[in-house]
Protein backbone atom coordinates (compact mmCIF):
# COMPACT_ATOMS: atom_id res chain seq x y z
CA UNK A 1 0.00 0.00 0.00
CA UNK A 2 0.95 3.60 -0.60
CA UNK A 3 -0.44 6.29 1.70
CA UNK A 4 -0.68 10.00 1.08
CA UNK A 5 -0.30 11.13 4.69
CA UNK A 6 -1.85 14.53 3.94
CA UNK A 7 -5.05 13.39 2.23
CA UNK A 8 -5.11 9.92 3.87
CA UNK A 9 -5.69 8.48 0.38
CA UNK A 10 -4.60 4.84 0.10
CA UNK A 11 -3.27 3.41 -3.15
CA UNK A 12 -2.67 -0.21 -4.11
CA UNK A 13 1.12 -0.60 -4.07
CA UNK A 14 1.08 -3.45 -6.60
CA UNK A 15 -0.94 -1.38 -9.11
CA UNK A 16 1.02 1.73 -8.23
CA UNK A 17 0.43 5.36 -9.08
CA UNK A 18 1.53 7.69 -11.83
CA UNK A 19 3.73 10.47 -10.49
CA UNK A 20 5.32 13.53 -12.02
CA UNK A 21 8.48 14.59 -10.17
CA UNK A 22 8.51 18.36 -9.69
CA UNK A 23 11.36 19.04 -7.28
CA UNK A 24 14.08 17.15 -5.41
CA UNK A 25 15.83 18.10 -2.20
CA UNK A 26 18.52 16.18 -0.33
CA UNK A 27 18.56 16.75 3.41
CA UNK A 28 20.10 15.29 6.54
CA UNK A 29 17.57 14.50 9.24
CA UNK A 30 18.60 14.18 12.89
CA UNK A 31 16.61 11.48 14.70
CA UNK A 32 16.48 10.19 18.26
CA UNK A 33 16.27 6.42 18.61
CA UNK A 34 12.78 4.95 18.35
CA UNK A 35 10.85 5.40 21.58
CA UNK A 36 13.17 8.07 22.98
CA UNK A 37 12.29 11.17 21.00
CA UNK A 38 9.42 13.00 19.42
CA UNK A 39 8.92 10.49 16.55
CA UNK A 40 9.85 13.22 14.09
CA UNK A 41 13.19 14.71 13.10
CA UNK A 42 14.85 16.63 15.92
CA UNK A 43 16.63 18.80 13.32
CA UNK A 44 16.84 18.99 9.54
CA UNK A 45 20.06 20.07 7.84
CA UNK A 46 20.44 21.26 4.24
CA UNK A 47 22.41 19.31 1.67
CA UNK A 48 25.36 21.71 1.99
CA UNK A 49 25.64 21.13 5.75
CA UNK A 50 28.81 19.70 7.28
CA UNK A 51 26.77 17.70 9.83
CA UNK A 52 28.12 14.32 8.67
CA UNK A 53 31.64 15.46 9.59
CA UNK A 54 30.40 15.71 13.19
CA UNK A 55 29.30 12.06 13.33
CA UNK A 56 30.90 8.68 13.93
CA UNK A 57 29.62 5.35 12.64
CA UNK A 58 28.10 3.08 15.27
CA UNK A 59 28.10 -0.74 15.15
CA UNK A 60 24.95 -0.78 13.00
CA UNK A 61 26.39 1.71 10.49
CA UNK A 62 24.37 4.73 11.61
CA UNK A 63 26.02 8.16 11.64
CA UNK A 64 25.84 9.18 15.33
CA UNK A 65 26.22 12.62 16.84
CA UNK A 66 27.75 13.19 20.29
CA UNK A 67 24.22 13.61 21.72
CA UNK A 68 23.34 10.03 20.68
CA UNK A 69 21.02 11.01 17.84
CA UNK A 70 21.68 9.70 14.36
CA UNK A 71 21.72 11.43 10.99
CA UNK A 72 19.66 9.94 8.19
CA UNK A 73 20.35 11.07 4.63
CA UNK A 74 16.96 11.57 2.98
CA UNK A 75 15.95 12.30 -0.59
CA UNK A 76 12.75 14.35 -0.71
CA UNK A 77 10.85 13.97 -4.00
CA UNK A 78 8.01 16.47 -4.42
CA UNK A 79 5.58 15.01 -6.94
CA UNK A 80 2.14 15.25 -8.45
CA UNK A 81 0.10 12.05 -8.18
CA UNK A 82 -2.01 11.76 -11.32
CA UNK A 83 -5.10 9.55 -11.43
CA UNK A 84 -8.10 9.42 -13.74
CA UNK A 85 -10.07 11.84 -11.59
CA UNK A 86 -7.52 13.94 -9.71
CA UNK A 87 -4.07 15.46 -9.50
CA UNK A 88 -2.63 15.98 -6.03
CA UNK A 89 0.65 17.12 -4.55
CA UNK A 90 2.68 14.68 -2.48
CA UNK A 91 6.08 14.22 -0.91
CA UNK A 92 7.97 10.94 -1.24
CA UNK A 93 10.77 10.58 1.31
CA UNK A 94 13.47 8.04 0.51
CA UNK A 95 16.14 7.11 3.01
CA UNK A 96 18.09 4.06 4.17
CA UNK A 97 17.54 1.21 1.72
CA UNK A 98 15.48 3.49 -0.55
CA UNK A 99 18.41 5.88 -1.01
CA UNK A 100 19.65 3.76 -3.91
CA UNK A 101 16.19 3.94 -5.51
CA UNK A 102 16.17 7.74 -5.06
CA UNK A 103 19.59 8.13 -6.68
CA UNK A 104 18.56 5.80 -9.51
CA UNK A 105 15.41 7.83 -10.15
CA UNK A 106 17.44 11.05 -10.25
CA UNK A 107 19.84 9.41 -12.72
CA UNK A 108 16.90 8.20 -14.83
CA UNK A 109 15.54 11.76 -15.01
CA UNK A 110 18.94 13.26 -15.83
CA UNK A 111 19.58 10.71 -18.59
CA UNK A 112 16.59 11.88 -20.66
CA UNK A 113 17.83 13.80 -23.67
CA UNK A 114 15.66 15.66 -26.16
CA UNK A 115 16.63 17.44 -29.36
CA UNK A 116 16.07 21.17 -29.27
CA UNK A 117 16.77 24.14 -31.53
CA UNK A 118 20.23 24.50 -29.98
CA UNK A 119 20.97 20.77 -29.86
CA UNK A 120 20.36 18.07 -27.24
CA UNK A 121 19.17 19.10 -23.78
CA UNK A 122 17.91 17.54 -20.56
CA UNK A 123 14.27 18.52 -19.99
CA UNK A 124 12.93 19.47 -16.55
CA UNK A 125 11.98 16.59 -14.26
CA UNK A 126 8.29 17.46 -14.58
CA UNK A 127 8.34 16.78 -18.33
CA UNK A 128 7.93 13.02 -17.79
CA UNK A 129 5.65 10.74 -15.78
CA UNK A 130 6.69 7.62 -13.88
CA UNK A 131 4.91 4.59 -12.46
CA UNK A 132 5.63 4.16 -8.75
CA UNK A 133 4.87 0.73 -7.26
CA UNK A 134 5.96 -1.15 -4.16
CA UNK A 135 7.94 -4.38 -4.15
CA UNK A 136 8.96 -6.74 -1.37
CA UNK A 137 12.68 -6.53 -0.55
CA UNK A 138 14.72 -8.73 1.73
CA UNK A 139 18.20 -8.75 3.18
CA UNK A 140 20.06 -9.62 6.37
CA UNK A 141 17.10 -11.71 7.56
CA UNK A 142 14.60 -8.86 7.19
CA UNK A 143 11.81 -8.04 4.74
CA UNK A 144 10.37 -4.66 3.84
CA UNK A 145 8.47 -2.96 1.05
CA UNK A 146 10.33 -0.53 -1.13
CA UNK A 147 9.69 1.50 -4.23
CA UNK A 148 10.05 0.53 -7.87
CA UNK A 149 10.05 3.35 -10.42
CA UNK A 150 9.57 2.96 -14.17
CA UNK A 151 9.45 5.78 -16.71
CA UNK A 152 6.05 5.98 -18.44
CA UNK A 153 6.84 8.77 -20.89
CA UNK A 154 6.35 12.46 -21.57
CA UNK A 155 3.56 14.43 -19.92
CA UNK A 156 1.13 15.04 -22.79
CA UNK A 157 -1.66 16.91 -20.97
CA UNK A 158 -0.75 20.61 -21.12
CA UNK A 159 -2.84 21.51 -18.04
CA UNK A 160 -1.06 18.88 -15.94
CA UNK A 161 2.31 20.00 -17.32
CA UNK A 162 1.58 23.62 -16.35
CA UNK A 163 0.44 22.52 -12.88
CA UNK A 164 3.67 20.55 -12.43
CA UNK A 165 5.72 23.52 -13.62
CA UNK A 166 3.91 25.82 -11.17
CA UNK A 167 4.55 23.35 -8.31
CA UNK A 168 8.23 23.20 -9.29
CA UNK A 169 8.48 27.00 -9.37
CA UNK A 170 6.88 27.35 -5.94
CA UNK A 171 9.40 24.91 -4.45
CA UNK A 172 12.54 25.93 -6.34
CA UNK A 173 12.24 29.51 -5.11
CA UNK A 174 12.53 28.42 -1.46
Q: Where are the model-predicted features located?
A:
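Short acidic, glycine/tyrosine-flanked loop/strand segments centered on an H-E-D-like triad
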Residues: 79-115
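OB-fold ssDNA-binding interfaces and closely related basic DNA-contact patches used
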Residues: 1-87, 139-141, 146, 151-157
Amino acid sequence: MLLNTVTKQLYDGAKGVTVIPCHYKLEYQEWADFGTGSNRPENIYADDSDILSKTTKDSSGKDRLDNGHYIQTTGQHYVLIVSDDSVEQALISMSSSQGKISRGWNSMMMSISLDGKKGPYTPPSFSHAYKLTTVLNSGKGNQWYGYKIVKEGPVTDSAIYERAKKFYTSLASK
